[in-house]
């Protein structure tokens, strides 16, 4: 894999502080003995290395509050062996483990916990190795989507990958939750295109696909992050792309009635377009007008794109100058608002400094005009709110609902995301913003999926509930308690995920408030595979 310059802490500072902060337990000596030297310890000093690196990958300032729990230490492994040894050393104590890839967990679950915890930050595991002959790549899970896209574009103009468009999202968490993006109508989710993986389990065993078994390999590709162990790397299938694709990003400022009409028609066009096309919408409003930004993507030349939208959606009023031809890599930089492809390789870009909260729905039936009108009406009363709309269809409808844990395939029409964001100066209105979002979500209830109301684990939402794993009474009924959100995210795949969790992590070492629970009273406490700490050589 390509070598990148890792980020290091001062070992001497860590040695002195950890002994004081952690009471002379075994963690320091264990890490040192096993060659894990890149780490720092909790400090209340805002200028310390600890706080600088803690906040470096926090993508939602909502979780930078001084009242939010902080890890006892941050460890940055630089290899799969260091990652394995880190897990083994942490398990000698009583800490909860948190794994952070890009820091985009919508609920901050990759870097917060209600119990004392150690943060394993994967940012130094960000190498990408491209094999053009097999058209595959090994991607370390600390790589961001932008780093992955950049590595692909540097190697080939005819290959790409299907995943999200935000370049600072980590591949570890994104693929673990499925990974929807602008190419999903053509090639499915990111997780649909994973052909192997390396997982470090709770015992520190290093497992490839064969060693972990097909049930666990199935589970890690869409069953949510931070649940099964630590993903060291994904082996992905690279996908054919033309040398030129067509994109557009056009904003229309219109009255609410016209916006309602456009969105009502958009939902049919977005789902029914050929799979070579994607048309998504971002939107917001104020008291005077609605703004709708149309994001279009086509696997081909702009002449075909223009003739298609002229025929199917003339109301957009697109002109030839709106359609831009560029390479696949350039298109993802453009859609992310970047000026150059090389900027994709910068994992520390900050696109928005506002705190935010988001909720999501998936629809099975077309939304009526009154749903769009009511949604826009509510947006007009909250300028800090906005929406993101994505159509499914295409290849998404052809993949079986149990191919991976992500079940929202045939029959799923739209994914509708509701967001509210605010600046630090508006922090006093936080409760007001969250109340507005909850009322929008409640308003949409009659129009979206039911029994259960569907969600997407990469848009994890603790409003749906959570488990206090320290409460033994609750834990004994965890499978039924977790069912409400488990079936919302995974439908009937929830049951298979429970079985996979019981196989790979029966002691529930890797957990968070909405993680998949293992079966209680399992026949053995430590799974046979890797229980002696032995490694499977990859």
Curated annotation (Swiss-Prot):
Cofactors required: FAD; a metal cation
Major place of residence: cytoplasm
Any Pfam family matching the protein: BBE
Domain FAD-binding PCMH-type per the UniProt entry, residue ranges: 67-241
Record PTM text: The FAD cofactor is bound via a bicovalent 6-S-cysteinyl, 8alpha-N1-histidyl FAD linkage.
Membrane-crossing segments per the record: none
Pathway assigned to this chain's UniProt record: Alkaloid biosynthesis; (S)-scoulerine biosynthesis; (S)-scoulerine from (S)-reticuline: step 1/1
Record's protein name: Reticuline oxidase
Biological source species: Eschscholzia californica
């Amino acid at each position: 894999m390509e070598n990148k310059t890792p980020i290091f802490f001062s070992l001497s500072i860590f040695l002195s502080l950890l002994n004081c902060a952690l009471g002379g337990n075994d963690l320091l000596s264990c890490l040192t003995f096993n060659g894990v030297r890149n780490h720092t310890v909790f400090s209340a000093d805002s200028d310390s290395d600890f706080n600088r690196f803690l906040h470096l990958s926090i993508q939602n300032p909502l979780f930078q509050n001084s009242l939010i729990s902080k890890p006892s230490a941050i460890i940055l492994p630089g290899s799969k062996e260091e990652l394995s040894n880190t897990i083994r050393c942490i398990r000698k104590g009583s800490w909860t483990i948190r794994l952070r890839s890009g820091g985009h967990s919508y609920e901050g679950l990759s870097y917060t916990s209600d119990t004392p915890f150690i943060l394993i930050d994967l940012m130094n595991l960000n190498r990408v190795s491209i094999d053009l002959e097999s058209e595959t790549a090994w991607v370390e899970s600390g790589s961001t989507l932008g780093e992955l896209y950049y590595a692909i574009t540097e190697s080939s103009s005819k290959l790409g990958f299907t995943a999200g468009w935000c370049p600072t999202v980590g591949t570890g968490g994104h693929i673990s939750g499925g990974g929807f993006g602008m190419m999903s109508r053509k090639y499915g989710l990111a997780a649909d295109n994973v052909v192997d993986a390396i997982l470090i389990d709770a015992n520190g065993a290093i497992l490839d696909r064969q060693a972990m078994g097909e049930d666990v390999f199935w589970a890690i590709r869409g069953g949510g992050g931070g649940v099964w162990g630590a993903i060291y790397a994904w082996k992905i299938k690279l996908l054919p792309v033309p040398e030129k694709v067509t994109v557009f990003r056009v904003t229309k400022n219109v009255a609410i009635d016209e916006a309602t009409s456009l969105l009502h028609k958009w939902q049919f066009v977005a789902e029914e377009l050929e799979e070579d096309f994607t048309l998504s919408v971002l939107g917001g409003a104020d008291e005077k007008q609605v703004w709708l930004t149309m994001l279009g993507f086509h696997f081909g030349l702009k002449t075909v794109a223009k003739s298609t939208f002229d025929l199917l959606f003339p109301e957009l009023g697109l002109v030839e100058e709106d359609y831009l031809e560029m390479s696949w890599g350039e298109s993802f930089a453009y859609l992310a608002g970047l000026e150059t492809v090389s900027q994709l390789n910068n994992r520390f870009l900050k696109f928005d400094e506002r705190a935010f909260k988001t909720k999501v729905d998936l629809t099975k039936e077309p939304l009526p005009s009154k749903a769009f009108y009511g949604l826009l009406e509510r947006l007009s009363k909250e300028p800090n709110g906005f929406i993101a709309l994505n159509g499914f269809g295409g290849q998404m409808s052809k993949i079986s609902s149990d191919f991976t844990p992500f079940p929202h395939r045939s029959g799923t029409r739209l994914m509708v995301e509701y967001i509210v964001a605010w600046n630090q100066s508006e922090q006093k209105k936080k409760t007001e913003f969250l109340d507005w979002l909850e009322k929008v979500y409640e308003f949409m209830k009659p129009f979206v999926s039911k029994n259960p109301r569907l969600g997407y684990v990469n848009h994890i939402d603790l409003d749906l509930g959570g488990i206090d794993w320290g409460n033994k009474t609750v834990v004994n009924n965890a499978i039924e308690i977790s069912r409400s959100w488990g079936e919302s995210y995974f439908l009937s795949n929830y049951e298979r995920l429970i079985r996979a969790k019981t196989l790979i992590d029966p002691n529930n070492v890797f957990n968070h408030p909405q993680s998949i629970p293992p079966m209680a009273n399992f026949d053995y406490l430590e799974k046979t595979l890797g229980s002696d700490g032995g490694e499977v050589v990859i």
